[in-house]
């Protein structure tokens, strides 16, 4: 089974890598166009709201609730029942998200006032930042319909993933990045406010992503006519699982939204600095954490349906090993090379050396929580695959409260950096509580072999950090030209990878070990 997981994981990771690279290209284009100016803050705000809902409907609670039920129905091998279930789910979800999108467009000023309260207060008091409120309200009308298209895309992708067709859904985000980049180059020069071109890129990207997946769904024989099915037994089961999961699986996104709310009261640039650092954090998180979580959920669901407790625990252990192997060194690399990485990728046009420096502080704080973010992604399926959504909700409530407390403690003295620290701490608490819950339910307890493996990874990472510090000592990175920056950063990363890999090799760890559940 682990060989199949590795193959599926590599497929998802490869497609995700392509998407993340294009995502970085997109962010470079945005940084060059707007840097960390007011318009950039507004676009990131207008894009964050529908993206928050996307994570709930398309990637978060819906997928966690839908895939286990779909796996159960698919296991019955009744094609007609399967098609009817898909028709009712797609019809019900489609109606809900299109109505949600319409309401969002109509009340966009209210949404902006709610989550951008700092701008709204300035608007009421005729202060300069009040213009951000008007711009954000107008831009949100364009970006909000994205939620409808991407939710149906998420449904299609979940169906294909359940059928072990992972490549299509993993490739789909590439199209959004292409659309945003194209609009930035083709539409922005013709607009008085270039940020609107990016908003239209999001809207068009949603349509293109859905259109891309439909032919693959047709080939799978599951492109059926949507029907309203609120009382369909399968839909009722998905609803029952999804309602609590809406909160439990999206704690991290809710925390980021709270960060945006607080950041609207901080100095101009705060939202942009958090955005750019979050984007770099999302690169390893998506490439490794989300990729592993994507392939593990259908597998765990099948283990649960087949009452394979040993297989369930073994696959969970494999997932924890993989995110530890990738997450620990990635977190250290991002933390100790934050400013050089931001400078090489983004520093051009309106994105200055000062912007890179400011964003590097929040990236360091986010990097501290990277492993926790990844662990949450792979531990949560341990609940949802067993159709247990209540426990993550209880954990989510505690983590939400903790994040608010951490924000109060750290945001006042440290500003936007404090928001990133609070998010990382709440993610760490989330991962710890998820694991404690699984162990108490006797579903999964980390094995001794995995603990030993993690210790070896941590030691290797310490050696890697020493190599990074040695390479970077005495280097005034901000004073280098771009070519020299690229050479310096590349050599540092190559040495770091070589030291990390060499240490693992000296500990007797080989590639073949990841093809089995125990080693």
Regions found by a protein language model. Name each.
Residues 1-519:
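Membrane-embedded alpha-helical bundles of multi-pass transporters/translocases
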């Amino acid at each position: 089974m682990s060989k199949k997981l590795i193959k599926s994981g590599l497929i998802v990771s490869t497609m995700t890598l392509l998407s993340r690279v294009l995502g970085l290209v997109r962010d470079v284009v945005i940084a060059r166009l707007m840097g960390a100016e007011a318009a950039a803050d507004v676009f990131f705000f207008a894009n964050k709201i529908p993206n928050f809902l996307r994570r709930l409907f398309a990637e978060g609670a819906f997928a966690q609730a839908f895939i286990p039920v779909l796996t159960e129905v698919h296991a019955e091998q009744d094609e007609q029942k399967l098609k009817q279930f898909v028709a009712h789910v797609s019809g019900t979800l489609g109606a809900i998200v299109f109505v949600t999108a319409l309401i969002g467009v109509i009340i966009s000023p209210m949404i902006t006032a709610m989550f951008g309260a700092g701008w709204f207060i300035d608007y009421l008091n005729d202060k300069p930042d009040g213009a951000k409120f008007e711009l954000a309200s107008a831009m949100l009308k364009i970006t909000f319909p994205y939620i409808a298209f991407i939710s149906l895309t998420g449904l299609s992708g979940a169906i294909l993933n359940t059928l072990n067709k992972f490549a299509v859904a993993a490739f789909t985000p590439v199209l959004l990045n292409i659309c945003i980049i194209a609009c930035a180059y083709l539409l922005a020069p013709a607009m008085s406010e270039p940020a609107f071109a990016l908003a239209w890129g999001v809207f068009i990207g949603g349509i293109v992503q859905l259109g891309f997946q439909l032919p693959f769904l047709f080939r799978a024989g599951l492109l059926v006519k949507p029907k309203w099915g609120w009382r369909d037994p399968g839909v009722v089961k998905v609803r029952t699982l999804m309602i609590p999961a809406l909160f439990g699986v999206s704690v991290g996104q809710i925390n980021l939204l709270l960060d945006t709310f607080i950041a609207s009261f901080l100095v101009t640039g705060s939202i942009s600095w958090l955005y750019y650092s979050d984007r770099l954090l999302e690169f390893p998180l998506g490439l490794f954490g989300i990729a592993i979580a994507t392939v593990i959920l259908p597998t765990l669901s099948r283990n649960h349906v087949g009452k394979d407790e040993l297989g369930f625990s073994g696959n969970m252990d494999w997932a924890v090993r993989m995110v530890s192997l990738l997450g620990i060194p990635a977190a250290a690399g991002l933390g100790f090379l934050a400013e050089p990485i931001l400078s090489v990728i983004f520093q051009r046009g309106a994105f200055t050396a000062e912007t890179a420096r400011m964003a590097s502080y929040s990236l360091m704080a986010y990097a501290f929580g990277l492993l926790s973010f990844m662990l949450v992604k792979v531990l949560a399926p341990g609940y949802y695959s067993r159709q247990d959504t209540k426990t993550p909700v209880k954990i989510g409530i505690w983590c939400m409260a903790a994040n608010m407390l951490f924000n109060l403690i750290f945001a006042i003295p440290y500003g936007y950096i404090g928001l990133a620290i609070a998010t990382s701490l709440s993610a760490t608490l989330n991962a710890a509580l998820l694991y404690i819950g699984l162990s108490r339910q006797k579903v999964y307890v980390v094995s001794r072999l995995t603990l030993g493996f993690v210790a070896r990874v941590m030691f290797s990472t310490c050696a890697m950090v020493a190599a990074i510090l040695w390479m970077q000592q005495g280097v005034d990175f901000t004073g280098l030209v771009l070519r020299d920056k690229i050479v310096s950063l590349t050599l540092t990363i190559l040495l770091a990878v070589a030291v990390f890999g060499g240490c693992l090799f000296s500990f007797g760890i080989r590639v073949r070990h990841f093809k089995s559940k125990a080693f």
